[in-house]
Amino acid sequence: MSTQAQITAGTEAKRIGHINEQLVCNWLNTINSGHIIDGKPKTKQDIINQKTGVSYSLKSVTKNHTQCHLTSTRRWCEFFQIDGELKTWFDLFFGIPGEDVSDGLSSQHRLIKSQIDDTLNGQSLDWFNQNKNQIFDVIVRRGMSDTPVDYLIWFDKPTGETQVYDVNDLEELVTTGRWIMNDTTLHFINANDDKMFHLQMKGSGARYNSSYHSLMFHIYKCF
């Protein structure tokens, strides 16, 4: 259960987020009219141009990275039709809500790479690299609701700097990059070995529910 402080902080973060959306939307309208805040739940679209249909995903940041996707292991595996030994790896590495797959080894109720069979680790890493463009499609371009965006906006909150990137250009960086696995996380690095994405078990908030064991992706400003 969330504390009152967490609830208050979450409410304030949403309020500030809406303010930032409006600031960026207003800025876009100084360049081209017709932009409105879209902000439908469970989509990547934050701003859309009603005249052209062009849509944007907004990332308001204070660091060089920010969360870009969060989903339960169950939903992820269903979406990508993952089963068998590969599904076993996801259940071990990210954990199963309400179960302790570590049998008491971990306070997070999950296993890390060094505690999982090398064959399973290899199969999972192969899957991530064989599906790197499809993963990008989900975590950046369209989510799981098939509402694609055309551009990603990187809004630096401390400086107010706003940069706009074509999602197709970002996908080109993915095409030439690769996923690598560490003991507790996976990283995606581009052709220059710069980190572009980070994947971890969320591991925060109320313990051992589906949110706690979710796949949480961060995107890094390497472009």
Model feature map: region roles:
Residues 1-45, 49-51, 58-223:
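Nucleic-acid endonuclease domains
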